[in-house]
Amino acid sequence: MAQHDFVPAWLNFSTPQSAKSSTATFDKHGEHLSRGEGRFGISRRRHNSSDGFFNNGPLRTTGDSWHQPSLFRHDSVDSGVSKGAYAGTTGNLSGWHGSSRGHDGMSQRAGGSTGNHRHWNGSFHSRKGCAFQEKTPTEIREEKKEDKVEKLQFEEEDFPSLNPEAGKQNQPCRPIGTPSGVWENPPSAKQPSKMLVIKKISKEDPAAAFSAAFTSGSHHANGNKVSTMVPSVYKNLVPKPAPPPSKPNAWKANRMEHKPGSLSSSREAALTNPVSVTKPVVLAAGVVLNAPKESPSSTTPPIEISSSRLTKLTRRTTDRKSEFLKTLKDERNEDCSQSRDCDKLEGLRLEGSHTPEPKENGEQGCLQNGLSLPMVEEREVLSHSLEAEHRLLKAMGWQEYPENDESCLPLTEDELKEFHTRTEQLRRNGFVKNGFLQGRSSSLFSPWRSTCIAECEDSDTETSSSETSDDDAWK
């Protein structure tokens, strides 16, 4: 928590005295330096910088009362509470122990101060004001024993200058644990419960603890909800838990190749029956790859469960959509190919003046190379009806590269007229009625004859332009 970062430990006390002392200390710092009142320890003060600002002169007297020498203390953030000895007017010791209680061996900064200077190990040095020290060595040893017991405990009131009665009576000590414990677990109501929640979740499911670590202290209910929701979601989504992968290399192999066949059995159990596998595999691979880092033992962690659920939902919708689009595309493909076949038959026969025709059964023969080559290329792209036409032309004696064939002869005017009349009859009567192309072609053209007749009657003699535009659109 931010408020515990670099704040002294005495700010954690909830009593109003300490709050008053913490605020008033910093407010009245300079004021107390210049002012000498007739109270004990009035100039005793925290001094948080290391500029050696000490009172090295003799004992001050204001009126006829003693004052404690201005003993400033420089301490680090967690050095504990370090107190010096001071005496009252009668010379009796007050309840303040004269030893430093810091856990890091922080001794009192008394660089030439008139009071007694005492190191943390109990060695005793008399400086200028030896008369000011009235302790016997036995008392010092007793205090040393006490300090070993109470070494890391804090006095609640650290500033007797702000509370004049504090010097005349012993203040009860209030232990709050070691300073390291204070910094790691500050004494607030939220912190222990938060640590406890995370510990519980991490025993049940490490992935849930990973997600709960990001929730703030006010969202503990959410953290518990995650841990309680996980089993029900797990049962709903994965009815039969898949066996964990034997090697972690299986995940890496699946990441390297996103092929539909490379699905492992456990992932197929988690992702139910993928129909169009290629899209969800990439998502699932990304999802599953996060899983072994967090919990390789659990079959499907909750992160994967949620995203696999998403992929399942999206896959159902995309299946419906893709099936609809696929059927629509097939229907359009068949319609376009059928109309294209009709146009192509007419175009081939109308432009037959440029192509030689051998007199086999009076049917159409060789084509020119310029017409045959695009037809061969389109045959790979277009549907089965065009392949049927291609097979028909081959059976009638057509060759793919007929320029090397010596039997190809140019068409005459009579043959061209006969070709036009036959195509007109085909358009009016249908493909089969007058006996033209009856024997071989009737079985091949029969599946799409009815639709093709209507389309051919609608489009009179638009031949090459429509077919090329259709081809460009579908290539």
Curated annotation (Swiss-Prot):
Which residues are recorded with the post-translational modification Phosphoserine? S49, S76, S202, S383
Region called Disordered, residue ranges: 92-115, 160-191, 237-271, 292-318, 456-475
Query: Which GO CC annotations does the UniProt entry carry?
Result: nucleus
Tell me the Gene Ontology biological-process terms attached to this UniProt entry.
DNA-templated transcription; positive regulation of DNA-templated transcription; regulation of DNA-templated transcription
Q: Which GO terms describe its molecular function?
A: DNA binding; RNA binding
Low complexity compositional bias, start-end: 294-311
InterPro entries linked to this entry: Vasculin_fam
Q: Which UniProt keywords apply?
A: DNA-binding, Nucleus, Phosphoprotein, Transcription, Transcription regulation
Pfam families membership: Vasculin
List of residues that carry Phosphothreonine: T300
The domain of life for this entry's organism is: Eukaryota
Q: What is its main location?
A: nucleus
- Keyword Transcription in the entry? The reply is yes
The reply to whether Phosphoprotein figures as a keyword in the UniProt entry is: yes
Where does the protein end up? Answer: Nucleus
Protein's job: Possible transcription factor.
Its family? Answer: Belongs to the vasculin family.
Put simply, this protein is called Vasculin-like protein 1
Q: Which organism is it from?
A: Rattus norvegicus
**Encoding gene, per UniProt annotation:** Gpbp1l1
